Amino acid sequence: MKYALLSDIHSNLHALEACLAHAKAQGAERMAVLGDLVGYGAFPAEVVARCQAIQAEGGIVLRGNHEALVQTHSVNDASASLSLGGQTAQWTHDQLSPAQRFWLEILPLTACEDSMLLVHASADAPERWRYVEDERTASLSLDAATQDPAVRYVFGGHVHHQSLFYRGTGRQLMRFEPSPGVAIPTPKHRHWIATVGSVGQPRDGKPRAMYALFDSTAAKLTFQRVAYDHMAAALAVREAGLPEFFAERLETGR
């Protein structure tokens, strides 16, 4: 099965549609959205509707911290970036229908299938929204996930960067630097953990959208970058009256 792994869409409909089209062209058979559908961007209702359609078609959709933020207008996380998200929480809440807000509230935090654990943040405490950003935090997440012996792969988002770690000889965790579009063999005799990047708000200085393809049959992972009309997405943020900083982020990828 070939999975498209998409995370951190952040109400960016332009980026989401571009990634979905790209994934289908690459032969993706199942879509998995790993949380943070909303926040920051100008199209929360449209993105939620698109993700509801993905779920109805048999795809996976998980809850992220920005779904929690919309529900409560607060989140248990000390990150300064989430306080910026809080600036749009009420606006985002008001754009969504009651049915959409309820659907976001009942989304699961994790999903497990085909040797994979899917999660928005860290598998060691999914509801705490911890970042997987280095060998130490990746190891914590991987250790928790692999308490289930069926799990060989952990895929998440949250950090808005693409990264890959694997457990080598013994228990040492190794970091692998991925290149976009290059299929990486991920044999099942090892344990792997990856962050798939952000569809709707990349933060590595490049505005192209990010997602990943995982072929569970061939045991290969491919990180993808997709060009989309990020200037139109930024203009929509401005026209919605949202903070200028969010528009600039789309233009610069930071």
Functional labels for PLM-detected ranges:
Residues 1-57:
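N-terminal active-site segment of His-dependent metallophosphoesterases
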Residues 110-113, 162-166, 210-214:
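Short beta-strand scaffold segments in enzyme catalytic cores
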Residues 1-4, 111-118, 187-193:
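Beta-strand-turn-beta hairpins that frame and shape the catalytic cleft
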Residues 169-254:
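Acidic, His/Gly-rich catalytic cores of divalent-metal-dependent hydrolytic chemistry
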Residues 10-15, 39-42, 66-71, 124-126, ...:
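Active-site environment of divalent metal-dependent phosphoester hydrolases
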Residues 6-7, 31-36, 40, 60-65, ...:
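Active-site neighborhood of phospho(di)ester-bond hydrolases with catalytic His/Asp-centered motifs
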Residues 48, 54-150:
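Active-site neighborhood of divalent metal-dependent phosphoester bond hydrolases
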Residues 137-154, 159-183, 189-192:
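Anionic-ligand binding region
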